[in-house]
Amino acid sequence: MSTPLSSTPPSFSLAGKLILLTGGAGLYGRGLAAQLARAGASLVLASRNVAALETVANEEKALGHEVSARFLDQDDEPSILRLRDSVVKEFGRVDGLVNNAVSRPMKTIDGPLSQWEASMKTNATGLFAITRAFGEDMVRRGSGTIVNIGSIQGTVGPDFTLYEGLGMNALPDYFFHKAGMVNLTRYFAALYGPKGVRVNCLSPGGYYNGQHPTFVERYSKATYLRRMADDNDLGGPVIFLLSDAARYVTGVNLPVDGGYTAH
């Protein structure tokens, strides 16, 4: 029997890496912030809600982690460029970008087109703009990695039977822009790969957030692991993709869904 390692292999560590995480206080973001910080990253959180990010940063700093908060309006390219320039000026570089920010203004299929357009401004145009801005800086330095947080809803169609009778729904804008994210990942991986920059996508499955028990039961039965994802399920795969352990991994969409899309 092999003797267990006393510590994580260095290639899996984020120690010494400056990671920017967008949307660092929400459903995925809070758990990711904690796990990235505990993996050794120097972490910058960015979103419109700086007050919420400051709370997260202070909680993590109390644990001895290096975490700070910045304002970002992903709808606004000048805001993206100001964020990039200020972080690079302060820290010298950004080693990893985690595109986790998302806006979901469309609540029903019958919603006004203005809701669709608002969704695309953040989740499509904004995603492109921030990836290009930070990607160009990584290319100039010849290294870096980008992880896009997608969804299984970007790779499979909706199962409306999961929502029947529950007042819940699957909304078209989310399916549209998460599917686009997967192929935009491949585009940037092909463009930036020869210049030393890796780009990958991670697509979580259903994430438990206090949903109706009937939905939780239905969804869980559709997975091989018979449960929804929780805060402990995303950090490890994201850390792997950001780390040097994944140095030969680029252009992939990694499902983290308990087997939901393996059917």
Functional labels for PLM-detected ranges:
Residues 14-44, 188:
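Canonical Rossmann dinucleotide-binding motif of NAD(H)/NADP(H)-dependent dehydrogenases/reductases
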